[in-house]
Every structure is written in C-alpha cells, then in structure tokens.
Amino acid sequence: RQQLKMKVVMVRDSDVDISLNRRAEIANNNNADIFISIHVNSSYKREAKGPETFFVSLNATDKESYELAMKENESYKEIEKKVETDELKMILWNMAQADYIRESSKLAEKIQAELNILMNTRNRGVKQAPFRVLMRASMPAVLVEVGFISNLKEAKMMKKNAFYRDAAMSIFKGLKKYINK
C-alpha cells in the first residue's frame, strides 16, 4: 500500500463467501482504479499446474478457459439474465470496455510474468474468458488463479502460509511494474 501510494480495498479478510456480483460492486462503489480477484484453480486433469491470469472477453481464449469461467460463474448460483449474444450488443459492450480490456491485458501480462518466476513452472499464460466478476467491474480487472488445488504438489504447497505470501508478493510486483510502466 505504502510503496505504491494507493488505497487498497480488501473485499474480504476472512474465509467468508462474498458473491461475484458483490465483489465487483464493492470495487465499483469505491471507484477503484484496478480490480484484482485472486482464486485457486481446479481441474479434472490432475497434472494441470501453475498460475493463470485472466482478463475479460465474451469469447474465451480456449475451451478450457470457457469451461472454467462457466464453472466459476455457476458456482455462485446468482439469479441473473444470461449475457445476450446478440451481435450488436456484443459490439457495444466491447466498445464500452475497450480501454479497460487493453489495460487489463497489460496488467495480466505483468502479474503472470511474476507468478511464473515464483512457481518456476510452465507458463499457462494470460487468457481471456467471460468471468462474471470481471464483466461487472468498471475498471481494468484481472482474475488470478495462483495454482491448482487439484494438483497434489500444488495442493501441498497451498497448505503453507508462505505460498500465499509469495503469491501475494508476485501479484504486488506485477502490479508495481504495471503502474510504473
């Protein structure tokens, strides 16, 4: 906070569930300049490992990214109208989000690079997907998956506080590089 001279608003500081809609609403209500949503990933493929960083798009980078977004969006069972896929509405949404998407992409690249150094693993890359929490944010926004809880090695690492401290430091370094671009 002090190093970047910025106000940080934590959506939560304990293990309580806050809906995806509410998380974005908190950021929007606080007129946040940047939104970072931090998660742990899971996959039916036990060998899946490493961090991934996402930014919003109605079209996912790949099938796996789309399925992850749909799984995460569904897990909150919030009642909401389905995103309309009408071509004109998609074009208007993309135009309104263009600046945020461009900046989100840059932020995602910086964070992903730092996480790759930390995890010393294959670069899963920066991806795009229609995550609800990102679609509702009115600022540059990224969703960071710090690793796979379904991977035995990473799950073991996630039991240690040092893993989260190191992941947080990597995200901080990426954010710092983005801000000082």
What spans do the regions from the language model cover?
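Active-site-adjacent mobile loop/cap segments within catalytic or ligand-binding domains
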Residues: 93-181
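Catalytic-core regions of hydrolytic enzymes
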Residues: 1-84, 88, 98-109, 156, ...
